[in-house]
């Protein structure tokens, strides 16, 4: 019986087991059926990284990766900016940029975040003639006072190493272009991270040529500004860039349209913009060596250019007939030509870069609903229309994302019941903005910038633009290191964390290692561990370059992020050191001393301290000067200046007899004789530099003053003097003669007491001031001069003031009098000048000016009377030649006299002046 019971239980258990198996199978079949009915659909989206600032990450429908290749072409290549503007307006994306020469400059700036509109404005406002000028020197206003005086005399500078003449590699180091590119990159919204050009807003490549190996070099890292500068370094004209063992120059030598480089960036659709210059057709156009070299290169590059263009999916060739690669006067037309050419093909490009969604689900006949746009009134109707008309699920999702109002989109389809739900995620709304990491004033300004977006819907692109505007705002305030460290929307609030940044370190790279490090560091306005401002960089570049011991000064930032996403920034300072043994040559011809030559030879970086040791001499038919000196413009890290010199100076002067008209008296001006002045001695001075505008100096001079009889002489003088001079000088003029801006002030007091060894004890005070201003864009220049001198009655003849002439460091300017025509101990003179360019220019810049002077000079203070004031009027034609200013002038002096109670004008014969070259 027990076994029967066991068999009954076993049968019952088997039935239950089979029943359980059937239930499980039914559940599995049901789930499989449901799974077949519900399908999640995601679009094919782009896989490359979006490097721009975003409010939140967002998807973009899959398309071809677009690479833009910008050719060289000099000024012609500015048409690239017009192409970029058209692409922005048409919504054509750029995923990679490759550039050569000017194309590298345009492409590099665009990749770093400058918009086409900003580049358009830059192209119009930059002084291209100055940036590409072959003659290059330190700006006068950035030189120390004594440097200004020395360089004002020279027309030619030769470099030596020992006694070996150094032949420069090029006509220009292109410092101005280097500087503006450095500053533009430092002010850009996106800067390379880890010196990698892939981390810019758009990955970028600059194509250059290594002059050593003769190979093409594609720059993908390093200094962005230096890469642009290297790619545009035209051989012979601009110095190549030294990197490691390479000499990098214009990429157009080997690849003026480097389409194949786009492949290395993964570009699937390559757009080439051709702006290369055609061959010269007129033999007369090949008039200088570099044009001949350019023609040879152009001939050699014709076939490679065509081969590269065949690799492009689209070629844009603006109509640039009649435009020169070196003429920057028709920039607006160049921009418009590029814009027009790009607009013509923009729609076709937009179609060709599109890719169809793969394995799309046909949703014709499906019941469609949309989730996520319930509160999106501004664009809900448009989205509903897109969905209603859709035949493919992925295509509909892609079209919704193309509106740019959504960050994500997917669909769920029930293939059994023919229903589909589209899930759209709009850009997040925010109703408040919280900014941290900046000052309260800056935070308030940023809040104001985002006021229009509060509570509103916006596109992803608009969100990026507003965030970039915040960084641009910080750049305008000078913050070179500022960035948006984190952006997120949380609890209906837009949180923006800003890192203004501090400089971690400064790395100095010298080409030859001649200058001592403290000399370089004292000129830097930046400090490690402190915030970095753009004006500090600009000031540092100016100061270093103005020292005169560097051919080129370049600065850039390198950023590295730590594990916590905080950034460490290093400022790299690259210095191309100049050979410091220099010979300067100057020439001058005038109506007083005829031909004169100036020679100066000195070491301008003595012992690596930027101090100067050397000598100069000036030789003319009637004058001679020689001087040896040691000069430290700055002692150690201070602005204390020091110099010591030994000198010899001799000048021959005419003695005049001048008679003004009187009743029965004919006016005349006669030379009645000639005498000479000789000075020799030693001098030592200590003072303080007033930055680079001037200095205040105490100077002690022990010297011999001699009056040398020639055909006539005043009372013979030959005395030893020990003179203390306190001098204050400010010089902000942009030129020593014919300045258009700036001022010059010189005040000194001489004291020559007997207890210091002077054979004659005297004192004198002198003041002069010149003010220059311009109106109507520099087409009218005004100049005011004031001079006054007061000396005691014991002042010897050789130390008295002089009056007359149109320009000299020895005689106060007075149009209508000859140079050094009158001498005395009391001087008061004022002068006005108006200058304007001639409508017809005589080969070089030509100006016409009118002059008026009033004042006089007297022997004794008791003689000073207002009625004795002389007046002078004159006209002048001046030409700015390569060897200095050429001046032709005529003037007449007069005074008001009285005869038999009648006031009349007394005149003297007119004076004619001529000079060519700089003043010595």
Regions found by a protein language model. Name each.
Residues 1-14:
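N-terminal secretory signal peptides that target proteins for export/translocation
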Residues 37-100, 108-432, 498:
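Patatin-like phospholipase
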Residues 32-36:
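Sec/Tat signal peptide C-region and signal peptidase I cleavage site
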Residues 20-29:
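Bacterial N-terminal signal peptides
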Residues 852-873, 896:
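Outer-membrane beta-barrel transmembrane domain signature
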Residues 775-854, 859:
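Extracytoplasmic gating/loop element in the C-terminal half of outer-membrane beta-barrel translocons
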Residues 438-448, 460-461, 469, 483, ...:
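Gram-negative/organellar outer-membrane beta-barrel architecture
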Residues 335, 343-589, 600, 614-634, ...:
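Periplasmic polypeptide-binding modules associated with outer-membrane biogenesis and secretion
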């Amino acid at each position: 019986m027990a076994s029967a019971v066991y068999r009954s239980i076993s049968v019952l258990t088997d039935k239950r087991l089979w029943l359980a198996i059937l239930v499980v199978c039914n559940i599995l079949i049901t789930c499989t059926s449901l799974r077949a009915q519900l399908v999640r659909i995601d679009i094919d989206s782009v896989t490359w990284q979006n490097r721009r600032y975003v409010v939140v990450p967002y998807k973009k429908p899959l398309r071809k990766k677009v690479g833009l290749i910008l050719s060289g072409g000099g000024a012609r290549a500015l048409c690239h900016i017009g192409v970029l503007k058209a692409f922005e307006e048409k919504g054509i994306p750029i995923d990679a940029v490759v550039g050569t020469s000017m194309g590298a400059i345009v492409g590099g700036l665009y990749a770093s975040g400058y918009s086409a509109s900003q580049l358009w404005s830059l192209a119009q406002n930059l002084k291209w003639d100055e940036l590409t000028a072959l003659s290059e020197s330190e700006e006068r206003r950035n030189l120390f006072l004594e440097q200004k005086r020395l360089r004002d005399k020279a027309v030619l500078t030769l470099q030596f190493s020992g006694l070996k003449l150094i032949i420069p590699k090029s006509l220009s180091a292109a410092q101005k272009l280097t500087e503006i590119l450095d500053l533009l990159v430092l002010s850009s919204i996106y800067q390379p991270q880890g010196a990698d050009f892939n981390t810019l807003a758009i990955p970028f490549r600059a194509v250059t040529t290594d002059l050593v190996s003769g190979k093409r070099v594609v720059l993908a890292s390093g200094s962005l500004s230096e890469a642009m500068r290297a790619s545009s370094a035209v051989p012979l004209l601009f110095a190549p860039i030294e990197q490691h063992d390479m000499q990098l120059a214009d990429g157009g030598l080997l690849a003026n349209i480097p389409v194949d480089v786009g492949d290395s960036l993964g570009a699937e659709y390559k757009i080439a913009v051709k702006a290369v210059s055609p061959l010269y057709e007129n033999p007369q156009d090949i008039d200088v060596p570099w044009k001949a070299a350019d023609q040879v290169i152009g001939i050699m590059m014709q076939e490679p250019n065509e081969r590269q263009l065949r690799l492009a999916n689209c070629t844009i060739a603006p109509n640039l007939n009649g435009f020169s690669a070196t003429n920057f006067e028709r920039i607006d037309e160049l921009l418009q030509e590029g814009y027009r050419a790009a607009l013509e093909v923009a729609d076709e490009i937009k179609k060709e870069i599109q890719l169809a969604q793969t394995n799309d689900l046909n949703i014709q006949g499906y019941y469609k609903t949309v989730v996520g746009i319930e509160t999106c009134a501004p664009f809900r109707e448009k989205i509903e229309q897109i969905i209603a008309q859709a035949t493919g699920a992925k295509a509909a999702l892609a079209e919704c994302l193309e509106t740019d109002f959504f960050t994500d989109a997917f669909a769920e389809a029930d293939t059994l019941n023919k229903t589909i739900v589209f899930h759209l995620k709009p850009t997040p709304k925010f109703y408040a903005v919280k900014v941290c990491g900046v000052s309260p004033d800056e935070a308030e300004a940023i809040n104001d910038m985002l006021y229009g977006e509060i509570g509103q819907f916006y596109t992803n692109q608009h969100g990026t633009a507003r965030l970039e505007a915040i960084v641009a705002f910080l750049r305008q305030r000078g913050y070179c290191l500022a960035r948006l460290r984190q952006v997120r929307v949380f609890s209906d609030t837009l949180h923006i964390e800003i890192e203004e940044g501090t400089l971690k370190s400064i790395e100095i790279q010298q080409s030859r290692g001649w200058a001592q490090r403290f000399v370089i560091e004292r000129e830097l306005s930046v400090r490690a561990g402190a915030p970095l401002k753009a004006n500090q960089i600009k000031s540092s570049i100016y100061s270093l370059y103005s020292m005169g011991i560097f051919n080129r000064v370049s600065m850039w930032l390198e950023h590295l992020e730590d594990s916590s996403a905080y950034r460490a920034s290093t400022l790299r300072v690259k210095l191309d050191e100049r050979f410091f043994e220099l010979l300067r040559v100057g020439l001058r011809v005038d109506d007083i001393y005829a031909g004169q030559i100036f020679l100066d030879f000195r070491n301008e970086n003595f012992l690596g301290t930027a101090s100067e040791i050397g000598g100069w001499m000036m030789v003319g038919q009637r004058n001679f000067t020689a001087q040896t000196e040691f000069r430290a413009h700055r002692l150690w890290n201070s602005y204390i200046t020091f110099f010591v010199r030994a000198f010899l100076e001799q000048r021959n002067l005419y003695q005049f007899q001048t008679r003004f008209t009187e009743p029965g008296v004919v006016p005349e001006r006669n030379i009645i004789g000639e005498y000479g002045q000789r000075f020799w001695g030693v001098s030592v001075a200590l003072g303080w530099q007033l930055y680079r505008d001037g200095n205040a100096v105490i100077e002690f001079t022990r010297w011999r003053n001699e009056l040398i009889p020639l055909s006539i002489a005043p009372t013979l003088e030959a005395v030893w003097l020990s003179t203390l001079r306190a001098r204050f000088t400010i010089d902000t003029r942009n030129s020593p003669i014919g300045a258009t801006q700036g001022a010059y002030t010189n005040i000194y007091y001489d004291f020559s007491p007997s207890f210091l060894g002077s054979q004659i004890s005297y004192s004198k005070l002198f003041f002069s001031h010149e003010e220059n201003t311009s109106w109507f864009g520099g087409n009218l220049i005004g100049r005011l001069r004031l001079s006054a001198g007061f000396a005691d009655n014991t002042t010897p003849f050789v130390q008295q003031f002089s009056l007359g002439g149109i320009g000299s460091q020895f005689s106060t300017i007075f149009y209508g009098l000859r140079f050094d025509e009158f001498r005395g101990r009391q001087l008061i003179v004022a002068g006005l000048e108006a200058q304007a360019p001639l409508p017809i220019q005589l080969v070089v810049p030509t100006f016409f000016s009118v002059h008026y002077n009033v004042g006089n000079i007297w022997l004794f203070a008791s003689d000073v009377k207002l009625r004795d004031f002389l007046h002078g009027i004159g006209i002048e034609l001046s030409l700015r030649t390569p060897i200095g200013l050429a001046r032709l002038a005529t003037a007449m002096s007069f005074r008001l006299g009285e005869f038999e109670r009648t006031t009349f004008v007394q005149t003297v014969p007119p004076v004619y002046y001529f000079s060519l070259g700089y003043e010595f």
